Amino acid sequence: MTAAPELRPKSWIDSIAPYIPGSSKTLDGRPAVKLSSNENPLGTSLKAKEAYREAIDSLSLYPDSGATALREAIGACYNLDPARIIHGTGSDEILHLAAGAYAGQDDEVLYPRYSFSVYPLAARRVGATPVEAPDDDYRCSVDALLKAVTPRTRVVFIANPNNPTGTWITRAEVEKLHNGLPRNCLLVIDQAYAEYLDPECDDGALALAKNTKNVLVTRTFSKIYGLAAERIGWAYACPEIIDALNRIRAPFNVTIAGQKAAVAALEDQAFIQNSFKHNKKWRGWFENQMALLSNAGIRVIPSSANFTLLLFEGSLTAETAYKALMDHGYTTRWLPGQRLPHALRITIGSEKHMQDVAGILTSLVRQAL
């Protein structure tokens, strides 16, 4: 007698490595300073915290599924039409929605090497083929992306600034990429770290989305706004794209407390400016300290985000540095799972944290010589 077939997941799931979040504990289980998830070291705006607390009496209620007040606040802050804004459970949800709405079986989803790990996952979830274009020394190569476009390409993802490298491409490069894509291809510009860019480095993505029919720009409240726990993202595009994504978006996907906290966070631009200044100062200081170790094989990839990527190309390995920092109570992001076993991504933390990490790495380099 033939055995009954067993329940099995789709075959492509076996090829997906489970996501490993940044650790908040050392290898032996001790609490650690977490410099592995690119969270805001200044925490959260006091105004956002107060708005969150005030939402406690609404726990029995469903949230506004359209997040009207939040979309209006985003529109006011960024000078955008609220009707062309969609909200999500983090920007991750919107990235998945974009792939689901515009790609599928026999289609291709294109992205640069060394970019956000969600992009290939979003492609596979909808049966599309993920296609990786070569980078240019840890930076997105527009020419390589355009060369990789085929008649099957339906979605192109880029992160600007990029994660995990921290590099960015210019407005002219973004425009070149868009101009080189067919009109039936959706360009998704993931701007999770855009608020850390100097104003003169604006890549023009929101303006491009405002004036075109095939550009989607995503942003998040998890980074500079300090609301990572609430998982709130948003995106901007033409009405047709927003309508398509809203049709497949889960209802009630952002909590009442999260919506209220995000509105308050947008209104507290003093906190945002303080976060920006702190990050710029200590990222610059840390990168300068690490540049002093270049003769020992430590290479700094200049960052425009709230983290720095270090390449270990000498006798000191990234794995050794990762474990040593753990021993000193600091968790960072070692990246063998992203084919960067020679790299550490280090979140910009407090003044003390950055001084400690710089001192530890300097001592390790001297010991390895």
UniProtKB/Swiss-Prot annotation:
Family of this protein: Belongs to the class-II pyridoxal-phosphate-dependent aminotransferase family. Histidinol-phosphate aminotransferase subfamily.
Modified residues (N6-(pyridoxal phosphate)lysine): K223
MF-aspect GO terms: histidinol-phosphate transaminase activity; pyridoxal phosphate binding
Signal peptide: none
Catalytic activity: L-histidinol phosphate + 2-oxoglutarate = 3-(imidazol-4-yl)-2-oxopropyl phosphate + L-glutamate
pH effect summary: Optimum pH is 8.0.
Cofactor: pyridoxal 5'-phosphate
Gene Ontology biological process terms in this record: L-histidine biosynthetic process
Keywords: Amino-acid biosynthesis, Aminotransferase, Histidine biosynthesis, Pyridoxal phosphate, Transferase
Complex formation: Homodimer.
Gene3D superfamilies: Aspartate Aminotransferase, domain 1, Type I PLP-dependent aspartate aminotransferase-like (Major domain)
HAMAP family given in the database record: HisC_aminotrans_2
Pathways involved: Amino-acid biosynthesis; L-histidine biosynthesis; L-histidine from 5-phospho-alpha-D-ribose 1-diphosphate: step 7/9
Keyword Transferase: yes
Name of the protein this chain belongs to: Histidinol-phosphate aminotransferase
Stored SUPFAM superfamilies: PLP-dependent transferases (SSF53383)
Coiled-coil boundaries: none
Its job: Catalyzes the conversion of imidazole acetol phosphate to histidinol phosphate. Can also transaminate aromatic amino acids and histidine in addition to histidinol phosphate.
Keyword field contains Amino-acid biosynthesis: yes
Record EC number: 2.6.1.9
